[in-house]
C-alpha cells in the first residue's frame, strides 16, 4: 500500500462522509503545481474553488504570514489590533465602500449579509417585524449553513435539515421579470452570484446585472452580490459585477481574500447599511484576527500589483478559444469569463476528471455534467498549452 492509499484509508475511516474527493493526496504545492507523497506532479486547475487565485504559497503572502505569526496571531475583537484598521482601509478602498465587517468563511459572510439586510429592512426601510423577505436565485450556492441551505433550490442540500428558515423567495437566475414580480413592500434584498459557480459556471446575459441594479434602486431593495468565488480577479474583472459596470449595495467576499493561506471573509457596504449593527449584535472571535488581516493585506497587494484580473481576462480568452477547438460530440458547450470556465458535457463529467487526473491535471466536476477549469491566475500560457494537450487527449479517445 502506498502512503497516499494509507492516508485515504485513514481519512475515510475517521472522517464523516460529506465529501467525495478524487483519490489523490496533496502533500506539497507551489504556484500552479502540486505533488502527492509519492512525488507525482499535477497541475491544479481548481484552485481550491478559487481560493488560490494568487497561486499556491505565493512568497509575498507566505512572508506576511510568517512575519505576523512571530508577532501576534489572535486578540479577539475585545481589543484592537494593529492589522485590522489598515486592512479595513485597504479593502474598503478597493471595493469603493465605506464600511466592512470581517468574518472567517464565505458562509459566515453570507449569514452576516442576510442579518444586515433584514435589520436594515426593519430599522431603515420600515418593514413590519419578522416580515422581511430576501429574493435569491434558483441554482444558487451560498454555503452550507442553515440559512444558506434554506435558500437553496437543491433538495439534497436541504434533506434532513428541517425545519428550514423562512423569508426567502427563489426565482430563475437571469430572469428580471421574475425578480420584478417577486418584489413586495417587504423585500429587503436581492441576493445573487454574478456568475453561478456550483451550478455549472452559469453566466447571465449581458445587461442582466444592470437590470437588477435598476430594479433594486427603484424599489428601495438592497442588491447583494456574492462574489466569494467569482470575485477578486477570477472572472477577468476585480469583481464579476464589473462586467455590467454596476456596483451592488453589498459585496460578499471570501476565498481568495486569504490568498489560499488563511481563511478570511467579509461583507462590504456603505454606512447606512452596516451601521444597523451595534456592539454585541454580531461578531466572531476569529473574524478580522491579526494573522488573517496580515495575510489578506498581502493577498490583495498581489492581486493588484501583479494585475491578476487583467491576466485572467487575457489568458481566459485564450484558454476558452483552445477548448472550443476540440471537436467532440460529448462537449455541449464551453462557457466562462476570465479563468472561470465550464465545459458542459452531454454525459457525466466525473469520469473525464478522473482521466485527466491520471494525465496529471486536477479539476472537478460541478453540477454532474460540467467540468470546471479554474487554475490559479498566475498560470502561464505555456502551462495552459500543456493543460489543453491533456484535455485533447481525453476527448480524443
From Swiss-Prot:
Family under the similarity heading: Belongs to the class-III pyridoxal-phosphate-dependent aminotransferase family. OAT subfamily.
Domain of life: Bacteria
Major location (coarse): cytoplasm
Stored CDD domains: OAT_like (cd00610)
Function: Catalyzes the interconversion of ornithine to glutamate semialdehyde.
PANTHER family hit by this protein: AMINOTRANSFERASE CLASS III, ORNITHINE AMINOTRANSFERASE, MITOCHONDRIAL
Cofactor(s) it depends on: pyridoxal 5'-phosphate
Keywords of this entry: Amino-acid biosynthesis, Aminotransferase, Cytoplasm, Proline biosynthesis, Pyridoxal phosphate, Transferase
Top EC class for this record: transferase
Gene3D superfamilies: Aspartate Aminotransferase, domain 1 (3.90.1150.10), Type I PLP-dependent aspartate aminotransferase-like (Major domain) (3.40.640.10)
Species of origin: Macrococcus caseolyticus (strain JCSC5402)
Reaction catalysed by this enzyme: a 2-oxocarboxylate + L-ornithine = L-glutamate 5-semialdehyde + an L-alpha-amino acid
HAMAP family: Ornith_aminotrans_3
Keyword Amino-acid biosynthesis: yes
Subcellular location: Cytoplasm
NCBIfam families xref list: Orn_aminotrans, PRK01278.1, PRK04073.1
Pathway it works in: Amino-acid biosynthesis; L-proline biosynthesis; L-glutamate 5-semialdehyde from L-ornithine: step 1/1
GO CC annotations on file: cytoplasm
Protein name: Ornithine aminotransferase
GO BP, one annotated term: L-proline biosynthetic process
EC number: 2.6.1.13
GO molecular function: identical protein binding; ornithine aminotransferase activity; pyridoxal phosphate binding
Gene: rocD
InterPro entries: Aminotrans_3, Aminotrans_3_PPA_site, Class-III_PLP-dep_AT, Orn_aminotrans, Ornith_aminotrans_bact, PyrdxlP-dep_Trfase, PyrdxlP-dep_Trfase_major, PyrdxlP-dep_Trfase_small
N6-(pyridoxal phosphate)lysine, modified sites: 255
Amino acid at each position: 500500500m502506498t502512503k497516499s492509499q494509507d492516508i485515504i484509508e485513514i481519512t475515510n475511516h475517521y472522517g464523516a462522509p460529506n465529501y467525495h474527493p478524487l483519490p489523490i493526496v496533496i502533500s506539497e504545492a507551489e504556484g500552479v503545481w502540486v505533488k502527492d507523497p509519492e512525488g507525482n506532479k499535477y497541475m491544479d486547475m481548481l484552485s481550491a474553488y478559487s481560493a488560490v487565485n494568487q497561486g499556491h504559497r505565493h512568497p509575498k503572502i507566505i512572508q506576511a504570514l510568517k512575519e505576523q505569526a512571530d508577532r501576534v496571531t489572535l486578540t479577539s475583537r475585545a481589543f484592537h489590533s494593529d492589522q485590522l484598521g489598515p486592512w479595513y482601509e485597504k479593502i474598503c478602498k478597493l471595493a469603493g465602500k465605506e464600511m466592512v465587517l470581517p468574518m472567517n468563511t464565505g458562509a459566515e459572510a453570507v449569514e452576516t449579509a442576510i442579518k444586515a439586510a433584514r435589520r436594515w429592512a426593519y430599522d431603515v426601510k420600515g418593514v413590519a417585524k419578522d416580515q422581511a423577505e430576501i429574493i435569491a436565485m434558483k441554482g444558487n450556492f451560498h454555503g452550507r449553513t442553515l440559512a444558506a441551505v434554506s435558500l437553496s433550490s437543491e433538495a439534497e442540500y436541504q434533506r434532513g435539515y428541517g425545519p428550514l428558515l423562512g423569508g426567502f423567495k427563489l426565482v430563475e437566475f437571469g430572469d428580471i421579470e421574475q425578480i420584478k414580480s417577486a418584489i413586495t413592500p417587504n423585500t429587503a434584498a436581492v441576493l445573487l452570484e454574478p456568475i453561478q459557480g456550483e451550478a455549472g459556471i452559469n453566466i447571465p446575459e449581458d445587461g442582466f446585472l444592470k437590470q437588477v441594479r435598476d430594479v433594486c434602486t427603484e424599489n428601495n431593495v438592497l442588491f447583494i452580490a456574492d462574489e466569494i468565488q467569482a470575485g477578486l480577479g477570477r472572472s477577468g474583472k476585480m469583481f464579476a459585477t464589473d462586467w455590467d459596470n454596476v456596483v451592488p449595495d453589498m459585496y460578499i467576499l471570501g476565498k481568495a481574500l486569504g490568498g489560499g493561506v488563511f481563511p478570511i471573509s467579509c461583507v462590504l457596504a456603505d454606512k447606512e447599511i452596516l451601521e444597523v449593527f451595534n456592539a454585541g449584535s454580531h461578531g466572531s472571535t476569529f473574524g478580522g484576527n491579526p494573522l488573517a488581516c496580515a495575510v489578506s493585506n498581502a493577498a490583495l497587494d498581489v492581486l493588484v500589483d501583479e494585475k491578476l484580473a487583467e491576466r485572467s481576462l487575457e489568458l481566459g480568452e485564450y484558454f476558452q478559444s483552445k477548448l472550443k477547438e476540440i471537436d467532440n460530440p460529448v462537449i455541449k458547450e464551453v462557457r466562462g469569463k476570465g479563468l472561470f470556465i465550464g465545459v458542459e458535457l452531454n454525459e457525466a463529467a466525473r469520469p473525464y476528471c478522473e482521466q485527466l487526473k491520471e494525465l496529471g491535471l486536477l479539476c472537478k466536476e460541478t453540477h454532474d455534467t460540467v467540468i470546471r477549469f479554474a487554475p490559479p491566475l498566475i498560470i502561464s500560457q505555456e502551462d495552459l498549452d500543456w493543460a489543453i494537450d491533456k484535455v485533447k487527449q481525453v476527448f480524443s479517445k
